[in-house]
Amino acid sequence: MGDTETRSPTRPRRPRKSRPKPETLVGYYRQMLLIRRFEERAARAYTEAKIGGYCHLNLGEEATVTGLMAALDPRDYLFTNYREHGYALARGIESRRVMAELYGRSTGVSKGWGGSMHMFDVTHRLLGGYGIVGGQLPLATGAALAIDYRGGDEVVMCTLGDGTVAIGAFHESLNIAALWNLPIVFVIINNGLGMGTTVAKSSAEPDLYQRGAAYRMESARVDGFDPVAVREAAVKAIEAARSGRPYLLEVITERLRGHSVVDPAKYRSAEEVERLKHEDPIQLFGSKLTANGLLDSDSIAAIGEEVAGIVTAAADFAASSPLPEVATLFDYTYATPVPNDSRRLPGQPLFEPLPLPAAAAAEAGVRA
């Protein structure tokens, strides 16, 4: 893994365009820092056994997440994979509800039943959070088809990891989207690694955005360390999708930790780990804003203190929130209520004899 040049493609340069207002840029920095501190607190809670299951973090991808969500209108829909905490925050969901979901509490964004990988919020049009690699692709494409069928003007954004481009659902979804001119933007979050496998070792075409050519789909690559560049590229992609031209966007980024909290990332060389320390997107963006007079040591400290308070409050809220009632386990599985025929609830031994219906019990008594 010492040959990092084969793992991460050169980050593309951003075309010169008018920059956002100063307060917007500072807002991007704050959003990125909130995601960073939130994910760090989540990692800590996981090691303290306050969070169960799997836990995948957006550490290192803060600029990518912030830029993408800054481009997406409130009316538009978002589908993500299991690395979605930062997207939920940047989409506008309260940090305490996101943290409560990680803790599995009833006050969480998915009522405590979704956990880290399955966050869902109709109000903010976040339609998952999917634990299966590529599971969001067909559903996002179907949502775009529904928009087109109803004559709506919304757009679907579907993010996926670089490890997803080799599965069948990727081809099927892009093919259908291109054939039917669906309003959808597919965003490949290329952090260079599918768990521990490099893109160069898993894809015959390492320039992943070039895969759009197979579907005659417009595509582009953008530097995921710059939230402004990401937003500009995403706006262009969304405008194309809204006019009936699906789009494939590849964002080059890095993850600062392993695939999940429990992954020690030993497949990385010491040189690569050291390089990543100097390519921290928050430090890079903060330095730019400081050089342009938009931030100074006092404002950076103030933002840091504010964000720390938000994250601490979120963790306290999650820890003090109640666990969901067992009876609500099936309440949020479907959009409409369905009969629940299950007779075994969580907490019952798997092989505990179930009570027989009255008729069967009576018949059994006769046979005895």
Regions found by a protein language model. Give the residues of each.
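Conserved acidic/glycine
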Residues: M1-T64, A71, L256-R257, A265-K266, ...
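Acidic side chains
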Residues: E39, D76, N81, D162, ...
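Cofactor-binding active-site loop characterized by glycine-rich and histidine/acidic residues
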Residues: E40-R44, E48-W180, T198-A204, Y209, ...
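A general secondary-structure junction signal
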Residues: Y82, V251-T253, T333
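Short, surface-exposed, polar/charged, turn-prone segments marking secondary-structure boundaries
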Residues: H85-G86, R105-V109, V185-V187, A213-R216, ...
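Short acidic, gly/pro-rich beta-turn/loop elements at beta-sheet edges
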Residues: A88-A90, G196, H259, T328
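Glycine-rich ThDP/TPP pyrophosphate-binding loop and its adjacent helix/strand module
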Residues: R125-S320
